Every structure is written in structure tokens, then in C-alpha cells.
Regions:
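Short glycine-centered, acidic/aromatic-flanked micro-motifs in structured strand/loop junctions
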Residues: 35, 74-77, 172-173
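Short beta-strand segments enriched in small/hydrophobic residues
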Residues: 26-48, 103, 167-171
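N-terminal hydrophobic targeting signals that begin at the initiator methionine
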Residues: 1-3
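Short, polar/charged alpha-helical segment
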Residues: 43-65, 183-188
Length: 188
């Protein structure tokens, strides 16, 4: 599945060009991300950065986009929402990215949601299962992972119906990420 995400990304870009009736003349497609390269979940940011760069380099080295190159720009947000907002503004207004890809974290993505809703920039494969990305009617948001609610419903079903457990203890992170999981568990 992981190998298919970058392929789907490029299919999405092609369809986006087609349906927007735009001719993309630029030789470089600039894609950007704000990632936790340092801080408490730096390993997640490093994984997204490493995986995306590996595939984008493969695409560029093998001329898969017919003489167009992908430039992947990333900035460290340390999993801090305020830094994510600053990074997003830099990516959009300074770097002039065509698409946003692989942002990591529920609190960080939630902080940029009002900005994203006003723009027509594709926001592709954020690494969060938050419901706020699924509740709106924004055609520029493309999710590839399950929602936290779907994951928790499956876990509760398994524990209750398959394992016969009637009590579940809950420990959750005290932020938007943890709260969403906790509420999803109560609803399941």
C-alpha cells in the first residue's frame, strides 16, 4: 500500500491538471510539506520525508513525468501548530508550491485547516485520521488513511465481539489527537 501512495499522487496530479483545464508549462512541480523533523514525533516526520524523497527521486531519475521534475520542499514544525502555520505560509507564498503532501499530525493539520479551506491547493495524504478532514466538502483534500473513528470501531468490535471483552481501559494524549480517539471510543 505504501508504494502505491506516490503513484496515486501523480495520478491525482494528472487528473487535477485535466479537470482544471490548465496547461502546466512549468518544468518543475513544487510539492511541499511541514513535518516534525525534530521534536517528540520526529521519527514520523523522518519517515514521510525519506519515503517521499526516495520516490520523487526515482520519478525524476527515470523521467516518469516526461521531462518534468518534482521538487519536494520540507520545513520542520517540531509537531507545533504555530510553526506549521508559519511553514504553510512560507510554502504557499514564498515557495509557490503546487501541492501539499504528507503533513504529519492532527493538531498541526487542524491549525492550518482554515487556511487550506480558502485555497485551491491540493492537500494530499496528510498523516492523520482526524474527522475534521472528512466532514467538509473540500475537493482539494485527499485522504488515504482510515479515520481514527473507523480504526477504533474495528478495535472495539474485535475486542468485544471476537475476544468477549466488556471493559476497556483508555489512556489518551491530552491534545486534539488524543481527544478525537477518546471521543471515537465513546461513540463506538
Amino acid at each position: 500500500m505504501i508504494k502505491r501512495i506516490p503513484i496515486l499522487f501523480f495520478i491525482f496530479l494528472i487528473f487535477y491538471y485535466f479537470f482544471k483545464n490548465e496547461v502546466f508549462e512549468e518544468k518543475t512541480i513544487v510539492v511541499g510539506a511541514s513535518l516534525p523533523k525534530t521534536g517528540i514525533i520526529k521519527s514520523w516526520g523522518e519517515s514521510v520525508n525519506s519515503g517521499a524523497n526516495s520516490y520523487f527521486n526515482y520519478v525524476n531519475d527515470n523521467n516518469i513525468l516526461n521531462d518534468k521534475k518534482i521538487r519536494f520542499i520540507t520545513y520542520d514544525d517540531k509537531y507545533e501548530p504555530e510553526m506549521t502555520i508559519d511553514n504553510l505560509n512560507r510554502l504557499i507564498f514564498t515557495d509557490k508550491v503546487y501541492a501539499l503532501f504528507g503533513f504529519v499530525g492532527t493538531p498541526t493539520v487542524k491549525s492550518i485547516l482554515p487556511i487550506l479551506e480558502d485555497l485551491e491547493i491540493p492537500f494530499f495524504a496528510p498523516f492523520t485520521g482526524a474527522s475534521f478532514l472528512r466532514n467538509g466538502n473540500n475537493s482539494n483534500f485527499i485522504n488515504f488513511r482510515s479515520s481514527y473513528k473507523e480504526e477504533i470501531e474495528k478495535l472495539v468490535y474485535y475486542l468485544h465481539d471476537k475476544k468477549g471483552k466488556n471493559k476497556i481501559a483508555v489512556f489518551y494524549q491530552n491534545d486534539d489527537y488524543g481527544e478525537e480517539g477518546y471521543i471515537s471510543l465513546l461513540q463506538a
